[in-house]
């Protein structure tokens, strides 16, 4: 029973790690803009990415104003790609 539990716990940790969103770009927010399709675009480093997560907008604007460093995490790490996760540093 303990061996089965250990294997199940190991597999769940592995699958959670495999699904983790990779870092795309780290830097300061250069600019932000609202789009006609109700999305919000930010430029960090050499990437211009969008999100439809309204709860991130005020946080990203604050990061831009204060010069905070952010890390955008996404699987679509190309200009015009979308994201839904940000780390504020």
Swiss-Prot record:
Induction: Maximal induction occurs at 37 degrees Celsius and in low-iron environments. Keywords: Disulfide bond, Signal, Toxin, Virulence. The keyword Disulfide bond applies. Changing residue 80 to D: Great decrease in cytotoxicity. Disulfide bonds join 24-77. GO terms for molecular function: toxin activity. Changing residue 36 to N: No effect on cytotoxicity. GO terms for cellular component: extracellular region. GO terms for biological process: symbiont-mediated hemolysis of host erythrocyte. Residues 1-20 form the signal peptide. Pfam families: SLT_beta (PF02258). SUPFAM superfamilies: Bacterial enterotoxins. There are three Gb3-binding sites in each subunit B monomer, allowing for a tighter binding to the target cell. Binding sites 1 and 2 have higher binding affinities than site 3. Belongs to the StxB family. This is Shiga toxin subunit B. It comes from Shigella dysenteriae. The gene is stxB.
């Amino acid at each position: 029973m303990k061996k089965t539990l250990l294997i199940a716990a190991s597999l769940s940790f592995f699958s959670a790690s495999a699904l983790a969103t990779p870092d795309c770009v780290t830097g300061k927010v250069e600019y932000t803009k609202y789009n006609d399709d109700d999305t919000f675009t930010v430029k960090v480093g050499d990437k211009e990415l969008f999100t439809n997560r309204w709860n991130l907008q005020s946080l990203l604007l604050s990061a831009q104003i204060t010069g905070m460093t952010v890390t955008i995490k996404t699987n679509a790490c190309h200009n015009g790609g979308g994201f839904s996760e940000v780390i504020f540093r």
